[in-house]
Amino acid sequence: MDSNCIQFLHDKTILVTGVPGFLAKVFVEKILRIQPKVKKLFLLLRAADNESAMQRFHSEVLEKDLFRVLKNALGDENLKAFITEKVVPIPGDISVDNLGVKGSDLLQHMWNEIDIIVNVAATTNFDERYDVGLSVNTFGPLNVLNFAKKCVKGQLLLHVSTAYVRGEKSGLLHEKTFHMGETLNGHRKLVIETEMELMKQKLKELQKQNCSEEEISQSMKDLGMSRAKLHGWPNTYVFTKSMGEMLLGNYRENLPIVIIRPTMITSTFSEPFPGWIEGLRTIDSVIVAYGKGRLKCFLADPNSVLDLIPVDMVANAMVTAAAIHAGKLGSQTVYHVGSSCKNPITFEQIHDLAASYFTKNPLVRRDGSSILVSKGTILSTMAQFSFYMTLRYKLPLQMLRLIYVIYPWWNGNKYKDIDRKIKLAMRLVDLYRPYVLFKGIFDDTNTEKLRLKRKEINKEMYGLFEFDPKSIDWEDYMTTIHIPGLITYVLKK
């Protein structure tokens, strides 16, 4: 199947949205590196015009260290010619009709040429503004679907979602599709059009009240979180992504749909080289804060499984699934791409590995001194965490407030600063709580069948499209690949 995957990409024209996002970049690099005879890659990215799109592609995609293997293989001049021939950055936006592509000639050309549509575009903020989440994560996929239906040669729409659309349930969480109007708590029926109307009505009220942009933004965030929790989802991100899946399933007609649901995506495992990453994602924020000596206590169940998966494994699963399902009219298949079912790692294990790493390899302050870390305190319930915060911070804060009241001429900046930090910490804990106290295991039966199909057909090239989590040695990966990658590419040290 590996050779079949490479052959599948031969002479294909592929539209990829969500560029220059982390996963989209890795997916694009993979295709260009393994199949130089791909016909064309249309890359949709937000930009004012063609020139801006090209500039953004070069600065935010091609110039990244991710592409160094391709650069070394081709050389600067050949790479430039190769990219000019194969890659077309397109200014656009999935939240509008026809993906915001301007020019009837260009649109017609794309509809005539595109074989595969890959939608990676999303807003991933857990507490995103509800208007933004709905336009990008919910109705964005519907716009991509409508665009894909106009593609004369269209063989497949591959949509990247997230495994956490399954909510906060415990036990084995299956790779099942959503039905239109389904909720996670079953209390009431979800009507997506009603959600859109509620959002628009609230926005209109806020504007009529002459609210500031900051007030509008916060109100939209609060609305998204409240609507999500009303229907059983922990946050706006997974709620709006779930509704996006519902729309795809309901309006797909005969177009083959593949939904890839990754878990927490981490740095590259092996391709194009180990350890490349961009930005702090979920657990990485905790690891970096710990390494900087800022994390003395954290809310987490030590025995909770954190489902991590390297980004190159997700990209490999995407290519393999596309090769398997292209042209299979009417099919809709969900794939969980994660590790909790086949090779789980717990929060306590990650904590211990991070402690071991930073003890042996401490980060260095600007003055050259080493940051010494000690094992932090892990509290497994919100009640324990709130009690700790009260003793450690809130009571001293009340003392500062009392001083401020008694002596109003005293500089109260310290009180305000600590108060702001505590509120921020509690908000972050509330956002991350569903993930660090997670009790579910993501079933990957469909994904395992995909792996077996690939392995049976072409054993000698099995490693080229690796996405088997059993191949990961977590201790080796975390201490020699992932954490060093965070330090190199995120902290830039």
From Swiss-Prot:
The keyword Lipid biosynthesis applies. Keywords: Lipid biosynthesis, Lipid metabolism, NADP, Oxidoreductase. Induction: Induced by wounding and salt stress. One of its GO terms (molecular function) is long-chain-fatty-acyl-CoA reductase activity. Expressed in the endodermal cell layer surrounding the central vasculature in roots. Expressed in the hilum region of seeds. Expressed in stamen filaments and receptacle of siliques. The keyword Acetylation does not apply. It catalyses: a long-chain fatty acyl-CoA + 2 NADPH + 2 H(+) = a long-chain primary fatty alcohol + 2 NADP(+) + CoA. Catalyzes the reduction of fatty acyl-CoA to fatty alcohols. Catalyzes specifically the formation of C18:0 and C20:0 fatty alcohols. Provides the fatty alcohols required for synthesis of suberin in roots, seed coat and wound-induced leaf tissue. Provides the fatty alcohols required for synthesis of alkyl hydroxycinnamates in root waxes. PANTHER family: FATTY ACYL-COA REDUCTASE 4-RELATED, MALE STERILITY PROTEIN 2-RELATED. This is Probable fatty acyl-CoA reductase 4. It comes from Arabidopsis thaliana. The gene is FAR4.
